[in-house]
Design a protein with these regions (language model features):
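Intrinsically disordered terminal and processing segments
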Residues: 2-8, 23-32, 36-131, 138-212
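Positively charged N-terminal leader segments that act as targeting/secretion signals
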Residues: 11-23
Length: 212
């Protein structure tokens, strides 16, 4: 006759709220702490990226744009829907034109005639705006481009003449898609190209084509 042994489990049953719930709680707490630390690290890192470098103030920009000129005329234009549409047509589909107002500074000769115009623009680079000036000859072509204020630790090479000179002589009807890139400054290059193209398009529509 086979003998069957029945073993009785004498260990007490685990009570709810034992070890595993506590471990799970600590895991969740550690995960949340890690997320918060990462968030604050990213926030601090973003703040540290803001490095403002001023190369030209407004007065210096005007002197550079119009050397020797004794009188500068400021002209502010509120754009009509027709003007904005004409500017948008020049810019094409890749640039969305959102401006409602444009301010130009005109250097005047002794006879009171404009020898050129300057516009100050702002375009977002990687995270912060690049403030720049564009000098435009009476024929609507670019004479000079200068970075006035740069606010990021990378991409500042766009302020060099070796890059900026690519814009010289270009007008509203000229291509801007063949501007050479700078390694490590792609976003800044795009922003400057966009800003200069907008400047010549505005000048063409307002003062050359005289669209109302």
């Amino acid at each position: 006759m086979a003998l069957t042994l029945n073993f009785i489990n004498t260990r007490p049953a685990k009570k709810p709220g034992g070890l595993w719930p506590r471990v799970s709680f600590f895991i969740r707490a550690a995960t949340l702490t890690g997320i918060l630390i990462s968030f604050f690290a990213l926030t601090v890192g973003a703040e540290e990226e803001y490095v403002e470098q001023m190369f030209l103030n407004k007065k210096q920009a005007l002197q550079l744009a119009f050397p020797g000129v004794k009188k500068v005329k400021k002209k502010k234009v509120w754009l009509s829907d027709t003007q904005r549409a004409a500017i948008q047509k020049i810019l094409g589909d890749q640039i969305e034109y959102k401006e409602r107002r444009v301010t130009h500074y005109f250097g005047l000769n002794e006879a009171g005639k404009p020898i050129g115009a300057m516009v100050i623009g702002n375009e977002i680079g990687r995270s912060y705006p690049i403030t720049f000036m564009v000098v435009i000859d009476p024929d609507g072509t670019v004479k000079d481009v200068e970075v006035m204020v740069y606010r990021e630790p990378h991409g500042w090479e766009v302020r060099f003449e070796s890059f900026m000179s690519q814009f010289f002589g270009r007008g509203a009807s000229d291509p801007f898609d063949n501007i050479n890139n700078i390694t490590g400054a792609t976003l800044s290059v795009r922003s400057m190209t966009k800003g200069v193209k907008k400047a010549v398009a505005e000048f063409q529509v307002i003062y050359k084509d005289k669209v109302k």
